[in-house]
Amino acid sequence: MTCLALASALRNPLLSAVGQAQTPTAAVLGLPHAGGTCRLFRGWERLLPQDTQLLALRYPGREARLTHAPFRRMSDLVEQILSATLFLEDMDLYLFGHSMGALVGYAVCQEMEARGRRAPSGLV
């Protein structure tokens, strides 16, 4: 992944970088539980290889996005995640979902397959 691709992806308010990988070639996208925040994944960057960027999903209605209306339908959330991760298609992308986040990750994988997009390298 180029730094430009990562910078483009991070322009989306849905994504937050956790730490900063040196010349990342892969990314892990953390999907928090219902009511959770990207803080759940703080410290995890130290557990990943140096070439893997940790990203976390920032749900609307939480933290810095407190004034943003929450999603009412899973399909709307999935659409936003697909848009946010479009710049990351040239790299290995892993989705890690906690509780409801796992369901979100599964729905994202299904929609990527339905659209013929490159599937994530892993879903946990």
Which residues are covered by each model-predicted region?
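Domain-scale detector for complete catalytic domains at protein termini or as standalone homologs
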Residues: 1-124
